[in-house]
């Protein structure tokens, strides 16, 4: 496990399934009170086509609920398509030995899946959301809508959950602000709160620092460290600094394939990152965060 090679198939680490390895690590860290982790994602021999082009090839990936994982790779490597395959926005090509299970199921209604998996896109909100108050934008997460339409029935519990999610993101002060008047960093906090209203066991973050200035990036990363105490983090990024100290596993992608999957300390090296991004990389680590130049 953790070897970069041309075939695109990551070697498997000894010691059982990924879920079993995570349980072993939790026990070694002294966590014996938490309930056993459940399987979240299982992919075997997954190919995904967009139009006539196959953009994901032979993907093998297993993630346990509550696990913290970073998917790292250059732009155009297939990360966005992998997200769509995980969130059931697109489905794999059916073939021999192919398997794609989310919580043990092949197919999901997207609104039902959002109760278990919170998804935060790299893009800022669509045209309707900027004319929505912060609290209403968060509540709209219950309906997977761009805003709160008049026909939607909002309960007191939904409002309570929305306030709770804003508080988790240290964004309660944004409840009465128009989303369109917020900074990029403030908007990202509201959108993550929107994904948290269901109290999902897993949170998928696509390029979380996209469009944020340095101060907003730092604030968001520290807030997400708190979220990581109660939910698994699946982070898709090409920025090393996005990888929180709580994330111990890294999956590397290149040219539509997983080329390495292993412990963060084994994969975040200058040699491996230089191979992955095709450019000479110099690394430094500070307070659990890695930076490159």
Language-model regions, residue ranges each:
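A short, proline-enriched helix->beta-strand linker immediately N-terminal to the Walker B motif
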Residues: 197-201
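Conserved ABC ATPase "signature" region
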Residues: 139, 154-174
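Conserved ABC ATPase signature
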Residues: 151-153, 178-182
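Helix-to-loop junction immediately C-terminal to a conserved catalytic motif
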Residues: 87
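Catalytic Walker B motif of ABC-type/P-loop ATPase nucleotide-binding domains
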Residues: 203-207
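ABC ATPase nucleotide-binding domains
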Residues: 271-293
